[in-house]
Amino acid sequence: MIVVSDATPIISFLKINRLDILNKLFGEVLLPEAVYEELTSNSTFQEEAEQVRACEFFKKVSVGNSETVDMLMRVTGLDLGESEAIVYSDENKSDLLIVDEVRARHVATSMRLRITGTIGILTAANENGLLNKDEAIERVKILRMSNRHISETLLNSVIENLK
């Protein structure tokens, strides 16, 4: 299974200290170079950067067509990491793109890429027995308090749908 991720979902899983969920659900997660750099080059977040570097299930990959990335950024206003994640997913016919930003999700969906986000992965972790309902709800609440843009409506929907 080819799974590609943007930086924001990885940051969310760092915030809830559960990067292991990505490994358990997907085995390997591909990070385009710009995404990897975004996660590992900020001197303010060295501890988190080291956690990303230490994860053997993250694999840094290169996008084949940088012109397509540049064009996508110009046309959509997406950042470099989001654009590389979308282009790499499209070039390599990924099975899943993990992305949270609304605009990036719309672009990916319009390109017929299969997407999920942090909440979808937490739901899948619950369905696969990696988190019980209370643990999943607690993680979503932590993310909400960490300014991860989770509305009250989404929180209530998650609570309602967890097992």
Task: Please give the residue ranges for each predicted region.
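Active-site-proximal, substrate-binding regions of enzyme catalytic domains
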Residues: 1-94, 102, 113, 153, ...
